[in-house]
Structures are given as structure tokens and as C-alpha cells.
């Protein structure tokens, strides 16, 4: 379930790889540290699948693995994970504000965050923030 191909986005990984990075970011914020087993539990993937994905992300310089097996994001991995997480949170908030139930809003935001252009996302963010300010 983790592939890297010629048609990938500029950062060089597909949606599944981006989901791993975002999950590492979230788990680190929540727990302070992250290991492969934590990813497997959180994402409900098998340990071998997570191990393969983690090694690909390490080879691509998105994460580091220390001698005790703890995962950390590289500067590039951190930047990408933060960008994805920002998109996820904002899109979820927008959908919920429009009356979409929380579960559907989060699921759809997770799908869209990977394919929406930077230009389009920035316009949504501008619009959302402007409307929030107008309501205060």
C-alpha cells in the first residue's frame, strides 16, 4: 500500500507516504515519541507494511530512525507533514462549518489534502480566515 512512482507529486511520495508523515507528526505531538509499532497501531497496518514504508521514507530522507527505533521527521519531512496537517485541519473545519458531520468532514479532508493545489488551498484559507474575522 506504499508506492513511489514517476507520476508522484513534486516531493516524491504518494498519498500513503504522506499519511505516514502526517501520522508521525500527530503521534509525536500526542505522545512525545514515535516508533514503528505506534504507527502500526494508529494506522491499523501490519508491522511488515509499516516497516517497508518507514524504510522507504528513511531512504527518501523524510524521516530518521535512531538506534532505539524512534522515528523523527527530517526538515523536509517536517515541512511536508506540517503542510498536510494544516490542510487537513482547515479543510475539516470548513466542511464542519458547512454542516458536514465530523466523521465525513475528516475523511474527505484526508482525501483532498493530498491532491489540492497550493494555489487553491491558499484561496480557501484566505476566504475561511476572512469570514472568521468578519464573524468576531
Which residues make up each language-model segment?
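Canonical helix-turn-helix DNA-binding module
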Residues: 36-67
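Arg/Lys-rich, alpha-helical DNA-contact motif
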Residues: 85-118
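DNA-binding alpha-helical recognition surfaces that contact promoter or target DNA
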Residues: 22, 52, 107
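C-terminal regulatory/oligomerization modules of transcriptional regulators
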Residues: 3, 8, 107-136
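Residues within the alpha-helical elements of helix-turn-helix
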Residues: 42, 80, 97
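Residue-level signal for threonine
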Residues: 14, 73-74, 117
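N-terminal helix-turn-helix DNA-binding core of bacterial DNA-binding proteins
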Residues: 12-45
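Basic, amphipathic "hinge/linker" alpha-helix immediately C-terminal to the N-terminal HTH DNA-binding motif
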Residues: 69-87
Amino acid at each position: 500500500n506504499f508506492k513511489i512512482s514517476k507520476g508522484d507529486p513534486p516531493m516524491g511520495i504518494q498519498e500513503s507516504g504522506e499519511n505516514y508523515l502526517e501520522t508521525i507528526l500527530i503521534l509525536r505531538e500526542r505522545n512525545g515519541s514515535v516508533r514503528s509499532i505506534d504507527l502500526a497501531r494508529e494506522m491499523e497496518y501490519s508491522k511488515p507494511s509499516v516497516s517497508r514504508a518507514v524504510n522507504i521514507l528513511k531512504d527518501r530522507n523524510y524521516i530518521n530512525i535512531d538506534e532505539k527505533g524512534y522515528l523523527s521527521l527530517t526538515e523536509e519531512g517536517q515541512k511536508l507533514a506540517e503542510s498536510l496537517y494544516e490542510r487537513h485541519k482547515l479543510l475539516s473545519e470548513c466542511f464542519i462549518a458547512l454542516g458536514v458531520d465530523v466523521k465525513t468532514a475528516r475523511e474527505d479532508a484526508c482525501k483532498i489534502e493530498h491532491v489540492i493545489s497550493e494555489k487553491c488551498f491558499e484561496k480557501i484559507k484566505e476566504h475561511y480566515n476572512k469570514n472568521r474575522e468578519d464573524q468576531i
